[in-house]
């Protein structure tokens, strides 16, 4: 019987898809395109603004829920998020399980003036140059998907291109690995990508062990302002919200409600 996890299956598909894209656009060419792209925006400054920041996600589907929303125009959705006060727009680009694409990333980048995060399963340097070529200011690195030397190498390459890495963890041991690699922004995902199970107490366990100079982002489980406030109380600097926004009838207002809660005087402030 196979012991392969959900994460293993996703990465297998990602590797095949990256190889197919590289057969069309070489590493040399994608590097040249990345160099020609507009300089990346300052993600760290955006995330350090007062209050609890909102990273709003363009997310068509997920492995745990299947199709989430029919997003006719990701640019319109991204503009709604920006108008609602989001600090960063996250765009899923993994195509097999999340129905994302680099076309979505292109559309969002052209539509908004705030930083954009490429959310994918980054396993090869090619994808980092690809992210920059398509206008990303930030990208996701998942500790559980990467051996330590690879994590450190990909993080270094990300920062060498002027981008910011959101380094995702699910356990205290993964958080230690992220810090060892030099992560400046750590996202704690309540969902275990190997099993898809959700542990809502995950952030509260891990965040107190992170240095005060690390930006702490809570991922998964934000359905409204109450969840944002709970994460703020546990030490979050920002929350990443996908499903709760793409399934909303009014995404702009949904983001605005979160932003209002995150900047309210009663909202717990991150310790710095």
From Swiss-Prot:
PANTHER family: INDOLE-3-GLYCEROL-PHOSPHATE SYNTHASE (PTHR22854:SF2), TRYPTOPHAN BIOSYNTHESIS PROTEIN (PTHR22854). The keyword Cell wall biogenesis/degradation does not apply. Its EC number is 4.1.1.48. Keywords: Amino-acid biosynthesis, Aromatic amino acid biosynthesis, Decarboxylase, Lyase, Tryptophan biosynthesis. It catalyses: 1-(2-carboxyphenylamino)-1-deoxy-D-ribulose 5-phosphate + H(+) = (1S,2R)-1-C-(indol-3-yl)glycerol 3-phosphate + CO2 + H2O. One of its GO terms (molecular function) is phosphoribosylanthranilate isomerase activity. It comes from the Bacteria. This is Indole-3-glycerol phosphate synthase. GO terms for biological process: L-tryptophan biosynthetic process. InterPro entries: Aldolase_TIM, Indole-3-glycerol_P_synth, Indole-3-glycerol_P_synth_dom, Indole-3-GlycerolPSynthase_CS, RibuloseP-bd_barrel. PROSITE patterns: IGPS. Belongs to the TrpC family. The keyword Amino-acid biosynthesis applies.
């Amino acid at each position: 019987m196979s012991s392969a996890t959900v994460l293993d299956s996703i990465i297998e598909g990602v590797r095949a898809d990256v190889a197919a894209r590289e057969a069309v656009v070489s590493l040399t060419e994608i590097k040249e395109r990345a160099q020609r792209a507009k300089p990346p925006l300052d993600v760290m400054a955006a995330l350090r603004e007062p209050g609890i920041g909102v990273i709003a996600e363009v997310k068509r589907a997920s492995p745990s829920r299947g199709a989430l929303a029919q997003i006719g125009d990701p640019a319109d959705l991204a503009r709604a998020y920006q108008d609602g006060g989001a600090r960063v727009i996250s765009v899923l680009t993994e195509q097999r399980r999340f129905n994302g694409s680099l076309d979505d990333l292109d559309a969002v980048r052209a539509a908004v003036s705030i930083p954009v995060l490429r959310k994918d399963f980054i396993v090869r340097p090619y994808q980092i140059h690809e992210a920059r070529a398509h206008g990303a200011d930030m990208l996701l690195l998942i500790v559980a998907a990467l051996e330590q030397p690879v994590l450190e190498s990909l993080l270094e390459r990300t920062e060498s291109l002027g981008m910011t890495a959101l380094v995702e963890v699910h356990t205290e041991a993964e958080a230690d690995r992220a810090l060892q690699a030099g992560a400046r922004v750590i996202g704690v995902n309540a969902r275990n990508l190997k099993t898809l199970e959700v542990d809502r107490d995950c952030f509260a366990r891990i965040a107190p062990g992170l240095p005060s100079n690390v930006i702490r982002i809570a991922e998964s489980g934000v359905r409204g302002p109450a969840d944002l406030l709970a994460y703020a109380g546990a030490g979050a600097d920002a929350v990443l919200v996908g499903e709760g926004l793409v399934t909303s009838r009014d995404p702009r207002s949904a983001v605005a409600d979160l932003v209002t809660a995150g900047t309210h005087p009663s909202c717990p402030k991150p310790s710095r």
